């Protein structure tokens, strides 16, 4: 059997330590580009696009293996710095646990949930934040997605849902926070997230994170509906060297926030050294 094709990677910067940025979703490539460009002034930055659905089944293990191939050359110089956003933060922890010698430090931005208590808190917070119109639109899109069979239309519906969720998860976004639009991958989201939840249900995660040797820093907005303190508590049971840093007046995606973006970049740069 032929090995799967390598994944797409974008490069930024010409000097400094290697930093790898993992996007969220799963299935939302390109959203880390503003952060990559900013860090490119001081670091050599890799922005991999996680594998899309279709060629091989998508699992956490598949994404870890793909990332290992991306890092083959940078690792010749030594361990790298790994930064993940949302789902990408969850993948960063999985990689650091399964290949601990590859990673010098880990930064988690708006990390996702690893237990039922945290997920229930997230769902409750999202419900509180949604306006009646947003709730109706989300319910309508979810109903259409449930019966749609065309891949392209499913991806379009998924992208609309993602935009609505991002709006609810933000606090005071900058007026000029438009991001480049890349195709979303609804099937990739579904396959990967099902496997991630299975790992939690079987007790594999977060227990396997006890193998992480690198220091871990969580950067979390105080207005992020993902419950940062609860997520930190679930991880700290297994990761002794984990630090929680909260940004005031900040939603899920710090770099788009009017009151938090500058503090976020300052903190992220300090964490990466």
Stretches found by the model and what they are:
Residues 107-146:
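Flexible "cap/lid" loop of the alpha/beta hydrolase fold
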Residues 225-231:
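Conserved alpha/beta-hydrolase "acid-adjacent" motif
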Residues 46-87, 264:
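Active-site loop/oxyanion-hole signature of alpha/beta-hydrolase fold enzymes
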Residues 5-57:
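Conserved HGGG/HGGXW glycine-rich cap/lid loop of the alpha/beta-hydrolase fold
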Residues 140-207, 214:
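Alpha/beta-hydrolase
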Residues 212, 218-220:
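Short beta-strand/loop motif that positions the catalytic acidic residue
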Residues 250-262:
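Catalytic histidine-centered segment of alpha/beta-hydrolase-like enzymes
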Residues 79-122:
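Conserved hydrolase catalytic core segment
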